[in-house]
Curated annotation (Swiss-Prot):
Top-rank taxon: Bacteria
UniProt-recorded Gene Ontology molecular function terms: translation elongation factor activity
Similarity comment: family membership: Belongs to the elongation factor P family.
NCBIfam families: efp (TIGR00038), PRK00529.1 (NF001810)
Protein name (Swiss-Prot/TrEMBL): Elongation factor P
Cysteines paired by S-S bonds: none
Described purpose of this protein according to its UniProt entry: Involved in peptide bond synthesis. Stimulates efficient translation and peptide-bond synthesis on native or reconstituted 70S ribosomes in vitro. Probably functions indirectly by altering the affinity of the ribosome for aminoacyl-tRNA, thus increasing their reactivity as acceptors for peptidyl transferase.
Organism (species): Mesomycoplasma hyopneumoniae (strain J / ATCC 25934 / NCTC 10110) (Mycoplasma hyopneumoniae)
Length: 185
C-alpha cells in the first residue's frame, strides 16, 4: 500500500481495478478542512489521462510494473511491432493504446515495454528524442518581435514549433512528455 501523500510523477498504482501512473500531483489544504491530493494520472490500460482527487492520508495499492527494454521495428498501420533486445522475441501493441507515443517512434529507437501480470500495457519513451525535420518554411525577415517560431514537420509526421534558425534536414531534440522543441540535435 502507498499513501497518496507520497505521490510523485512516475509512481504506478491500482485504483478501482485499473492501473494508473502519476503524471503530476499537487497537495492542497484549505483552512480547517482535510488535505487533498489532486493528481493528473494516466490509465495504463486505456491511455486516458484524467484528474483524480484523493483525501490526504488515503492509501492505494502499489502496482508493480515490469519494464522490458525493446527496440521499435515497424508500424503496420493497426499495431506496432517491438523486439526484445535480449531474447529477440517480437511483440505487437495496438496503435490505439499508444496514440501519443506514435508521434515519436522511428525505426530502431529503444523503448521500455510496460507489463503488469503478463498483460501488455503500453510503452515508455525516453524523456527526449532526436528527430529530423522533413519540412519547414524559411524565416520571414522582420518577424522577430518576441521569441519567434515557425511550424516544422518531423520525420514521423508530427508538427512542432521551432526557432527561426532551424532549417529543413536538421535534427532537433524534442521532449516526448509535451512534444515541444528542446534544442538542436
Amino acid at each position: 500500500m502507498i499513501n497518496v501523500n507520497e505521490f510523485r510523477p512516475g509512481i504506478t498504482f491500482e485504483f478501482e481495478n485499473e492501473i494508473y501512473v502519476v503524471i503530476s500531483a499537487q497537495h492542497s489544504k484549505q483552512g480547517r478542512g482535510q488535505a487533498n491530493v489532486k493528481t493528473k494520472v494516466k490509465n495504463l490500460r486505456t491511455g486516458a489521462i484524467t484528474i483524480k482527487t484523493f483525501s490526504g492520508g488515503e492509501r492505494v495499492e502499489k502496482a508493480h510494473i515490469e519494464k522490458i527494454s525493446m527496440s521499435f521495428l515497424y508500424n503496420d498501420g493497426a499495431s506496432i511491432v517491438l523486439m526484445d533486445d535480449s531474447t529477440y522475441e517480437q511483440v505487437a501493441i495496438e496503435n490505439t493504446k499508444i496514440t501519443w507515443e506514435l508521434n515519436f517512434l522511428t525505426e530502431g529507437i529503444k523503448v521500455k515495454l510496460r507489463k503488469f501480470n503478463n498483460e501488455i500495457l503500453d510503452i515508455e519513451l525516453p524523456a527526449k528524442i532526436e528527430l529530423k525535420i522533413t519540412s519547414t518554411f524559411d524565416a520571414v525577415r522582420g518577424n522577430t518581435t518576441t521569441n519567434p517560431t515557425k511550424r516544422a514537420t518531423l520525420e514521423t509526421g508530427y508538427e512542432i514549433d521551432v526557432p527561426l534558425f532551424i532549417k529543413e534536414g536538421e535534427s532537433v531534440i524534442v521532449s516526448t512528455e509535451d512534444g515541444k522543441y528542446v534544442s538542436r540535435g
